[in-house]
């Protein structure tokens, strides 16, 4: 038998690879070059064919007829239009396509939807996808309308959307896009200026659908609830999305997760949204969310929860920056309500305002929130609880946190209302009760962004003895950086607790009383008002009578100066001989 030439064998392998994933018999069909209309091309096409559409406006009801086809506007959506002309139909229909189909490169406009089972209900103004596997890319859905899914409605399908724009569409549910059952992955797309009279101005998903949203923008959308988006009995993920300038008359200006929804959420920018409750986000009715590494800023609630409105959930909010939000009633930053135990960790809650109470946070009606390593700073209210307010059987636990520089008519830092109780564990707080063993008031030394300075009293004052403490801070810095965890959302380098060497009584000057304090500490077991490390004039790691003698020598005989920090207060720079634990205010 003769052997095949190697060159022919290689050519055969190359051709096989190039044709892989597409039927070798598939054809490209040109519109209008070969066929006058898209539907004429569909009628004769077979599974796997591509219909390549030249620039122009096509007023057709494009029905894939159950075929696995790619319909492509070859010059893109700027030049290729599928126009429903306001007829009572969707512009495009994909139904019962079990392998895959694709729509790419079109502006789909002026559609009105088709009947979708319920009386007087129309679905998918621009595109309807039913029981199909479909890919939609590089398309714009413009000025379509229907009952569900003004731009696109997907039902019991697996749909992938990328590089698309949903602009100025309208529906009762899901102005830009709605998904009922099945799955939807949407990436690098925009929902802009869509409107819903009901749920989800930009995007609605329900029916236990699986939703994954990546790198998308939801801008200037409006709805009754969930101005930007509304997830109800859905699961999945949202990541790296901009949610800005959306509006809801009820809950969730930026977006609303409700009715047993379960989502992993990260990297959101939720900015300048408005709603009655939950100007930025609403999380309600037994949803379970893990929201991390996001910014919630500049949102407004006409009632409760300027940044986030949390109602009956067990969600986790971690590494969030909740800043500059406002509420007309309670909870400028966060409003946590009713019989849940949300977890708030490594969060910066800064510069929020509520008119009535709880400028930073309000906890009400039996909620048992847990705050771990949070900084609640510079919030305000005209009522009680500039930092945090609890009332009506609420029982928040606050661990390793800072409550500082908040402002209120009464009870500026923390306000405990009727039938409420706080559990405070290692908290630096304005207005701290000196009788509270694990709470203290010293200068947190925070900058305008909530970061502690090198002399902050929050440094090294945290406890490790609490279950489930986060491993890193809000910026991903490992904890601890010193001997113990720092309080608040940020972990700082060093050991904090600046002092003046030789200032044994902590009055920030070196005088004869410091020598007497050393002697009292050594011979009468008296406490020092400063930290013991400051009493160690020689910085040799021990407090002895020599330290008292050297203080006297410096004062009266022009003797040698003490070791650093001197002559100005600062942190200990010699960690070999330091006793930073002697400066701790709170025990373990």
Per-region residue spans from a language model:
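Bacterial N-terminal signal peptides that target proteins for export
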Residues: 1-10, 20
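C-terminal segment of classical bacterial N-terminal signal peptides
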Residues: 16-23
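Predominantly extracellular beta-rich ligand-binding scaffolds that present long acidic/polar faces
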Residues: 61, 65-69, 135, 156-165, ...
